[in-house]
Amino acid sequence: MSSSLEQLKATGTTVVSDSGDFVSIGKYKPQDATTNPSLILAASKKAEYAKLIDVAIDYAKQKGGSIDQQVDDALDRLLVEFGKEILKIIPGKVSTEVDARYSFDTEASVNKALHLIELYGEQGISKDRILIKIAATWEGIKAAEILQRDHGINTNLTLMFSLVQAIGAAEAGAYLISPFVGRILDWFKASTKKEYSKEEDPGVQSVKTIFNYYKKYGYNTIVMGASFRNTGEITELAGCDYLTISPNLLEDLLNSNEPVPKKLDASQAASLDIEKKSYINDEALFRFDFNEDQMAVEKLREGISKFAADAVTLKSILKEKLA
């Protein structure tokens, strides 16, 4: 019998590796890979990645400028070095994240994205292998709209916890979205003090709702479930366009022979009764409807704050080496 991982791929789901630790991902044969500041920070503390930091430091020193400018340059180059190494292992695309401190600044997000794409270009990597990852705030959704429409740069809207964000992202023409699963479960468990079966899992339900909405209304934006706490959440989403999975859960799926039947089916979405909404030209309605979802508001705030904090930690490591 084939492994649960192979069965998951057979349902039509594209498997993506969620890790900066590129040494460990090859054996799972993922199509794409995702990174974020937290994953890069974790990987950068490992000895085998020291040479990537050295490259970034040398680059920043050569460019010169103030110490803060050098730190920014080193961080950008480090993100690109990780992306470059990951792209040697996978056939598809890598997601590289814009600093979360720009989550409420459309112009700064666009400029940072253009700069990252330029840095990749200097390494001989074309923009069609990169997804620029931006938090799914109103400003982030607008940045994605500009990048997709005016620059042909593909985006991954992340920290997505609600259908409101997903609708805005689809209308913006985002290439891909990352609705989070495990972090939604965390919130509900803390809030209700209940345990949830994989079928009841509110994070799983959130992704199913978004998937069905997109398929019913014919959006081409890829739905990539993210942030998993266990393999049950993953197998409940078999058939989702993409799933991005950490190496430890990929290992569990590889070592399991549990059956993985298809659970999400685009062809069944057409008959579902789902109300169509529009947000892309109505910031006030987007903000109000999003604000009505306490879980999504709290988790987006927390996610931006954590990614920003990990970027600050990464910068402090780089600053020490630049001194």
Swiss-Prot record:
Pfam families: TAL_FSA. Monomer. Gene3D superfamilies: Aldolase class I. It is an enzyme of class 2 (transferase). Belongs to the transaldolase family. Type 1 subfamily. Keywords: Allergen, Pentose shunt, Schiff base, Transferase. Its EC number is 2.2.1.2. GO terms for cellular component: cytoplasm. Pathway: Carbohydrate degradation; pentose phosphate pathway; D-glyceraldehyde 3-phosphate and beta-D-fructose 6-phosphate from D-ribose 5-phosphate and D-xylulose 5-phosphate (non-oxidative stage): step 2/3. GO terms for biological process: D-xylose catabolic process to ethanol; pentose-phosphate shunt, non-oxidative branch. Important for the balance of metabolites in the pentose-phosphate pathway. Involved in xylose fermentation to ethanol. InterPro entries: Aldolase_TIM (IPR013785), TAL/FSA (IPR001585), Transaldolase_1 (IPR004730), Transaldolase_AS (IPR018225). The active site is at 133 (schiff-base intermediate with substrate). The keyword Signal does not apply. It catalyses: D-sedoheptulose 7-phosphate + D-glyceraldehyde 3-phosphate = D-erythrose 4-phosphate + beta-D-fructose 6-phosphate. The keyword Transferase applies. This is Transaldolase. One of its GO terms (molecular function) is transaldolase activity.
